[in-house]
Curated annotation (Swiss-Prot):
The UniProt record lists the keyword Glycosyltransferase: yes
The protein's Enzyme Commission number: 2.4.2.21
Pathway: Nucleoside biosynthesis; alpha-ribazole biosynthesis; alpha-ribazole from 5,6-dimethylbenzimidazole: step 1/2
Name of the protein this chain belongs to: Nicotinate-nucleotide--dimethylbenzimidazole phosphoribosyltransferase
GO biological process: cobalamin biosynthetic process
CDD domains per UniProt: DMB-PRT_CobT
Function of the protein: Catalyzes the synthesis of alpha-ribazole-5'-phosphate from nicotinate mononucleotide (NAMN) and 5,6-dimethylbenzimidazole (DMB).
Length: 338
């Protein structure tokens, strides 16, 4: 679907009339769940997940058949500051790896039965160094938001967004600090594996960006423009498109959560259609999830990004939906006690 906005004002307007969860589907799913051949509440959180999914899909007996994993790749000007353990050219190399089917995300998509798309966002033209100037112009931000919006398959019934971009945990840390408050050190982690003096340098970069753009940080979209990256903006655009289309979303790690947090800062209901697939080993991720009110499904010590933790969670949600829709009721099974 072509993005319905050509400016940041147009993107903001999207959030003025967001669709709501289908209350009738929630009621039907809840009623069905109460009659299934199990003790009430015996499936724990799976029951809540299934009912949540039913409400956003709009079907009291839903199916999960067409999950989409949308990966966005962008390069960052701050990568030249040595904030990552890897050089900027790795972004392009990893995109080639995705297309060849050789990355972890490819294997996890196959196991989860998910389609995978990869959107490259001007990889030959990094964002600007946000310690010197805003990372993006307004037009560049709008283009990235639109690219994310248009990458969502209207036929999908679940969306996971992932990212590739050397330097993007630095941008995510800056976004989180700007939106949530606190110091650069509280939000800056090891990312690709930096430690010691390299981590100190990364933290200084975040602090410098926050100081330079202090006057702009009261506006979530200005936070994204000044401190973010094209792939982070595209993830926000994709999550917004899913919200408008009532497509459920599983959020991934710290970078994805920072993108989602921009939407949450615009209006908290912007993430009603989203759950957190996991909590990552990136140190600030638990705090970021708490700030947007999301409880993770998994804690596996993962810190790869690229949507991987959320993809692992797809089959948990699929299991929940299968139980709600596939189990027999007490009456159907002829079992006493219902």
């Amino acid at each position: 679907m072509k993005a319905p906005f050509t400016s940041l004002a147009g993107f903001r307007a999207v959030f003025e009339t967001l669709p709501q969860v289908d209350a009738e589907a929630v009621e039907a799913a809840t009623a069905r769940n109460e009659t299934l051949t199990k003790p009430k509440g015996a499936l724990g959180r799976l029951e809540d997940l299934a009912i949540w999914y039913a409400g956003w899909i709009g079907d009291g007996r839903p199916a999960l058949e067409r999950p989409q994993v949308a990966i966005f790749a962008g390069n960052h000007g701050i990568a030249a500051r040595g904030v990552s353990a890897f050089p900027p050219e790795v972004t392009v190399q990893m995109v080639a790896n995705y297309r060849a089917g050789g990355a972890a995300v490819n294997q996890l998509c196959r196991v989860a039965g998910a389609s995978m798309t990869v959107t490259e966002l001007e990889l030959d033209r990094p964002t600007l160094d946000f310690t010197v100037s805003p990372a993006m112009t307004e037009d560049e931000l709008v283009a990235a938001l639109a690219a994310g919006w248009e990458a969502v398959d209207d036929e999908s019934d679940l969306l996971v967004v992932g990212e590739m971009g050397i330097g993007n945990t630095t941008a995510a840390a800056a976004i989180a600090a700007a939106l949530f408050g606190g110091t650069a050190a509280e939000w800056t982690g090891r990312g690709s594996g930096v430690a010691g003096s390299a981590l100190e340098a990364k933290t200084r970069v975040v602090a410098e960006g926050l100081e330079l753009h202090a006057d702009a940080l009261s506006d979530p979209l200005e936070v994204l423009r000044c401190l973010g990256g094209r792939e982070i903006a595209a993830m926000a655009g994709a999550i917004a498109r899913a919200r408008v289309g009532r497509t459920p979303v599983i959020l991934d790690g710290f970078i994805c959560t920072s993108a989602a947090a921009v939407l949450h800062a615009l209006t908290p209901s912007a993430l009603d259609h989203a759950i957190a697939g996991h909590v990552s080993a990136e140190g600030a991720h638990p705090a970021a999830l708490a700030r947007i009110g999301k409880e993770p499904l998994l804690d596996l010590g993962m810190r790869l990004g690229e949507g991987t933790g959320a993809i692992v969670a797809i089959n948990i949600l699929r299991s929940a939906v299968a139980c709600l829709s596939g189990m027999a009721t007490f009456a159907e099974a002829g079992v006493s006690g219902g």
